[in-house]
Structures are given as C-alpha cells and as structure tokens.
Amino acid sequence: MTSSVIHQAVIDAYRVLDTGEPLDRETALRLAALPGDAVLDLASLAHKVRLRYAGEAASLHACSIMNAKSGECGENCRFCAQSRHNSASIDVYDLAGEDAVLRQAEEAVDSGIPHFGIVTSGYGYLKITPEFNRILGMIDMLHRELPGLNVCASLGVLGEETSAALAAHGIAHYNINIQVAPSRYSDLIADTHTVVERIATVRLLRKHRIPVCCGGILGVGESMTERLEMIFALSELDVSVIPLNVLVPIDGTPLEGHRTADIADIVKTFAICRLVHPRTIIKFAAGRETVMKDFQGLLMLSGANGFLTGGYLTTRGREIDADRELGRQLESFTEG
C-alpha cells in the first residue's frame, strides 16, 4: 500500500486490523475528513475488522420490535412522532395486552428472528408501577411461551429497582440511546430531560449485568466531529450493541423537511464506529430503506453486523423476508 493509492489516514488505521485495539481519536478525526474517493477504502477496512473481531463472519444480529405503547409522550424529542409536543399523525394507544405481544413475538420467531423487543413511549420507569409490573408479566409470558427467544425492552429511563427487576426477569438486552454527542443533546434532541439521565440508566443496567443496546441517530444537525464525540462516549459505557439510526424526517415534528444526511458521511460514520468498537455489534436501524435505499447493502459491508427488521416505531421498515435474503447475499462477502 502506498499513500498515492490509499489515503494515509486509512493506512494508519490498519493497525486496528492488526492488533484489535480500538482506533484513537486523532486518527478518527483524520478519517472523518476523508474525501469521497477514499470512503470505500475505509469501508473495506471496517469490513475486515468486523470479520476478524466481531463474531462469526456470516452471523448478523437481527432483531424485531413492537411498539407496545404509542404516543402521548411528555418528552420533547425533536425527531420523534410520539411526543405530544409535536403534531405528527400517529396511532395513539395505551400498553398492549399480552395476547397482542405474543402474536407479534411469534411472527418474529416464525421468521427466524432471535431477538424481540418490547418498546413503550414515555419518559420511563424510575419506580415499579402497575404498568411496569404488566411489562414484567409480558416478559415472563414470552419466556414461558417462546423458550429460546431473546426478550429485550426499551422503556426509557430507569431507576435502581426497575433495573434490578428487569435483571431478575431475565431481560436479554435493554435499549436506551444517547442519540448524539452528549454536549449537543439538549439543543439537538430534547430539553425536558438530560442525557445524564440516560447515561445513568446505562450504568444501572450494567451494574445489574444487563447487556445494553445504546447508540444514536445521524442527520439531526450534528457535525462529523460531534458524531465522533458520540462514538467515543459509547466506549466509556461498556455497551454490547450500538444501533445507529439515520434520521427519517417526519411531518409534524421540528425536523419535518430536514435535509437528509450525506450518504458518504453515513458510510464514514459506520466505518469509524467499527474501528473504535472492533468487537461490538453495530446495528443499522431506521433509515435503511428511506435514506440509504440502494446503498443499504454498502453499510452492511462498512462494519455493521446487525439490523432491525420488520418495521420501526411509527414508520414502516423492510419485510423480514427481504432482509433475510439480503443477509444471504451478504454471506458471499464473508468468505475468505
């Protein structure tokens, strides 16, 4: 390799492939500034790192979620259709019943999806409430009816007793995102709560040995440097899965009509995230179909090794069968 063929920053980053040690901040900043014609070299490196350090080469982490409680959220997240501060047109309903949850979980199992998440709108549960107890009952029911299914949850901010309860009921993963660089959370995401509360929840979950799924959203007005701040902040939180969403601007939210993120910058972000987190599951969530479109397969070759399938909270996703076929096609890029 010579710098006339491959950008020097990419060459320097090859030490991650050689050693398995996470990328340093200085090199990450240089990679963030790469010109477009060097992005595929970076993507290739990230894919090699993923194959060497992030589990079985052909294994993709696939999960499905259920919006078990929708709308009427008192938080003012700027991207979210479920906030009552926004005027998006969505279905609004209270916590679903066990039968509805079981039906949707069975669909995931029948489709070969091993991870199923119960998601609720709202700030969260600092204490055990009757509604939280109903969720615990759902978790127990899924373990009983669908043994082998990894039951996950995303219920917002937690307290000590609710974190401990989820651990006692065998939750497989818990999702709570820091969304953006912590320094920009209040102006880019929300100011009715703080990112500190979310980080505290991650630490409580880790205290109780619950694997954490924690990532962010790209394209809400952050710079590449601020994306790096988020990526390195995740390094300090010992998370097991990093979901990266790409903003899908929703009518009736403050980000309605917002310009979509640049495709090459998204690829760079995923690739750098892989180099900073060589052994972590990096999951591509929202934005695959609507923003990345024809390029979503490229992201799966740029360090990602997981995806959310079957639909999101308030927007449609890809059919599970289509994602299964995508995974099969990607296997040819894992053969060495």
Swiss-Prot record:
Keywords: 2Fe-2S, 4Fe-4S, Biotin biosynthesis, Iron, Iron-sulfur, Metal-binding, S-adenosyl-L-methionine, Transferase. Its cofactor is [4Fe-4S] cluster; [2Fe-2S] cluster. SMART domains: BATS (SM00876), Elp3 (SM00729). Residues 55-288 form the Radical SAM core domain. InterPro entries: Aldolase_TIM, BATS_dom, Biotin_synth/BioAB, Biotin_synthase, Elp3/MiaA/NifB-like_rSAM, rSAM. [4Fe-4S] cluster binds at residues 73, 77, 80. CDD domains: Radical_SAM (cd01335). GO terms for biological process: biotin biosynthetic process. It is an enzyme of class 2 (transferase). PROSITE patterns: RADICAL_SAM. Pathway: Cofactor biosynthesis; biotin biosynthesis; biotin from 7,8-diaminononanoate: step 2/2. Belongs to the radical SAM superfamily. Biotin synthase family. Catalyzes the conversion of dethiobiotin (DTB) to biotin by the insertion of a sulfur atom into dethiobiotin via a radical-based mechanism. Homodimer. NCBIfam families: bioB. This is Biotin synthase.
